[in-house]
């Protein structure tokens, strides 16, 4: 399996990337939504995107909306990983097409459990 970690924080990209790599998932990185869309085009086999909400240029919600507007990306699972904790934010992300929602800070165990719910763990 191949995934992208989309977050403007290099530290967060490294943390999530390390967890995914431990699960046998190949990872590419992007620092904002526009760069994330470029990576999707450059890496057509991506099956999962872990996406932050608050990023410069194009935020995570806008990224999810752009991805879901293109039917070619229907199989891509989009997991919002963010500090946004309000129920309204959660619903906006899910309504836009997020497959799952993970609130920061998170533990490795929570992240793996969320990925298991999407049948990602063990797929690699």
Positions of the model-derived regions?
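Charged docking surfaces used in two-component/phosphorelay signaling
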Residues: 14-22
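Active-site beta3 strand of CheY-like receiver
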Residues: 44-50
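Short, glycine/charged-rich "phosphate-handling" switch motifs in NTP-dependent
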Residues: 99
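Receiver (REC) domain active-site loop signature in two-component systems and cognate sites
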Residues: 55
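C-terminal output helix
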Residues: 106-115
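Short hydrophobic/Thr-rich beta-strand motif most characteristic of the beta2 strand and flanking loop
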Residues: 24-31, 39
């Amino acid at each position: 399996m191949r995934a992208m970690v989309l977050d403007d924080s290099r530290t967060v990209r490294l943390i999530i990337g390390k967890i995914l790599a431990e699960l046998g998932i190949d990872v590419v990185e992007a620092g904002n939504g526009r760069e994330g869309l470029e990576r999707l085009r450059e890496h057509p086999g991506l099956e999962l995107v872990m996406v932050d909400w608050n990023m410069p240029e194009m935020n995570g919600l806008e990224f999810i909306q752009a991805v879901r507007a293109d039917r070619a990306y229907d199989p891509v699972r989009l997991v919002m990983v963010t500090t946004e904790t309000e129920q309204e934010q959660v619903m906006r992300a899910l309504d836009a097409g997020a497959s799952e929602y993970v609130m920061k800070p998170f533990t490795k165990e929570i992240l793996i459990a969320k990925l298991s719910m999407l049948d990602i763990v063990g797929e690699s």
